[in-house]
């Protein structure tokens, strides 16, 4: 039950939502990926597990309708993330630390051969050749659109070097919650390539 319920009442079932089924583009062997609802096995019928995030969103949408607050809720998250050329961490008995590096970062301006280094906090909407990850982000967006997730745009962000944003189109709350999982999955796996 993954910690959602006490052992004495832990019988659950996963009900797939066939509308979310897709072939995983990152698996060499064809693999079906699907989202669904976690249900507590109960009599006379199963009931939604009230701690499961997807069920919480669906219950919130139903509550909104039942109370005549609105028929639907549209949301628009922005997915901001970093892509680094190097990232590391260390834990020793007397210290803990991490380090990150991005070739286009201003602190690499003295390195030979880089040429296109972005000044501190001047990343916002930079173009090629300064934007070294344009192709990667475009690939992310194309993969998302193949899955039916419409993308408004993507661009470098103003913050630290290697900070980016992908913004989907406005969407219904429960659909956007499902899309959020897929967007994060696509960002992570495309960046890993």
What residues fall within each predicted segment?
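Glycine-rich, acidic/polar active-site loops that bind/position phosphate-bearing ligands
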Residues: 1-193
């Amino acid at each position: 039950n993954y910690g959602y319920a006490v052992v004495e009442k832990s019988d659950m079932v996963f009900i797939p939502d066939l509308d979310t089924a897709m072939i995983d583009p990152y698996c060499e062997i064809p693999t079906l990926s699907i989202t669904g609802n976690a249900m507590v096995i109960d009599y006379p019928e199963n009931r939604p597990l009230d701690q499961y995030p997807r069920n919480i969103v669906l219950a919130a949408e139903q509550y909104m309708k039942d109370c005549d607050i609105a028929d639907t809720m549209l949301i628009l998250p922005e997915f901001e993330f970093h892509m680094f050329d190097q990232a590391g961490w260390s834990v020793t008995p007397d210290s803990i630390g991490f380090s990150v590096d991005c070739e286009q970062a201003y602190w690499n301006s003295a390195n030979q051969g880089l040429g296109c280094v972005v000044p501190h906090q001047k990343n916002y909407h930079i173009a090629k050749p300064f934007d070294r990850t344009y192709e990667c982000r475009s690939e992310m967006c194309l993969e998302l659109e193949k899955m039916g997730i419409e993308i408004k745009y993507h661009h470098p962000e103003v913050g630290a070097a290697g900070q980016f944003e992908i913004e989907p189109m406005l969407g219904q709350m429960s659909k956007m919650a499902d899309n959020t999982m897929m967007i994060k999955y696509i960002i992570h796996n495309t960046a890993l390539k």
